[in-house]
Amino acid sequence: MAKDEDNSSVHLLDLPWEDVLVPHILRNLPLRHILSLQRVSKPFQSLVHLYLANCRHFDSTQLGSQLPKSTFSELLRNNTVLQKLDLQSCCDWLTDKELLPVIGQNHHLIHINLNSCGQLTRQSLVAISLSCPHLQNICLGHCEWVDCLSLRSLVDHCKCLEAIDLTACRQLKDDTISYLVQKSTRLKSLSLAVNANISDIAVEETAKNCRDLEHLDLTGCLRVKNDSIRTLAEYCTKLKSLKVKHCHNVTESSLGNLRKREVVLDVEPPLQRALVLLQDVVGFGPFINLQI
């Protein structure tokens, strides 16, 4: 009986690693829990290394600030199959030295998030353009090192771009954005927010070239005016959301048609806006009887 009991006992690590444990168990665990398994035993450490070498998605936000610079390169050292790379929570320390080896050996990346990674240089974006021909979505928000030449390199080599976030990339001007949208006509989402260099020229080029555009963020683009918003409404019939807060030259005369089409806008209609201001100034309650 004791012999039968010994033969029937199955341990977790007895299951097939590549066919069962990695794709069906580890893939469903938070990254921080997977990394903690390394402390259990050497076999578990080997299992985690196998997972890291074969994982398709690496999301540093799952670790928060717990991912030290010293271990980042080690974690992805043997991975050549990444499709999604989110390094937003590495923004305080990530440099070209850490990023370039990962980019250089992963040619299947589709989604990259480098939001606020301010210590990188244009060299990283050029490397992405040369190594990631299938790239569809890239976030470069608050990466002020992004310049005209590096963005043109990205556009020239990455023909499948559908979403790009250029929030606060203040080196970019109308001519560069025009080049982007002329080459990347499949764009569905674009952010040009917080860039005073952007004017009607870039917005109109976007409207005329990116007919499938669904989401556009122009927050804080002070030079954008009603004319380009009207052009946007005319050409981008699939538009779902538009952000124009703090665009002081954009008024209801251009937003009205979009509002009728139920495009989500981040500014209230004039009457509602006036009531909110009146409530703040006079101290009225939330309900106002307009018949008084």
UniProtKB/Swiss-Prot annotation:
Keywords: Cytoplasm, Leucine-rich repeat, Repeat, Ubl conjugation pathway. LRR repeats lie at residues 134-155, 160-181, 186-207, 212-233, 238-259. InterPro entries: F-box_dom, Leu-rich_rpt_Cys-con_subtyp, LRR_dom_sf. Residues 12-59 form the F-box domain. Its main location: cytoplasm. GO terms for biological process: bone mineralization; dorsal/ventral pattern formation; G2/M transition of mitotic cell cycle; positive regulation of BMP signaling pathway; protein ubiquitination; SCF-dependent proteasomal ubiquitin-dependent protein catabolic process. Pathway: Protein modification; protein ubiquitination. It is found in: Cytoplasm. GO terms for cellular component: cytoplasm; SCF ubiquitin ligase complex. The keyword Repeat applies. Belongs to the FBXL15 family. Substrate recognition component of a SCF (SKP1-CUL1-F-box protein) E3 ubiquitin-protein ligase complex which mediates the ubiquitination and subsequent proteasomal degradation of target proteins. Acts as a positive regulator of the BMP signaling pathway. Required for dorsal/ventral pattern formation. Part of the SCF (SKP1-CUL1-F-box) E3 ubiquitin-protein ligase complex SCF(FBXL15). This is F-box/LRR-repeat protein 15. The gene is fbxl15.
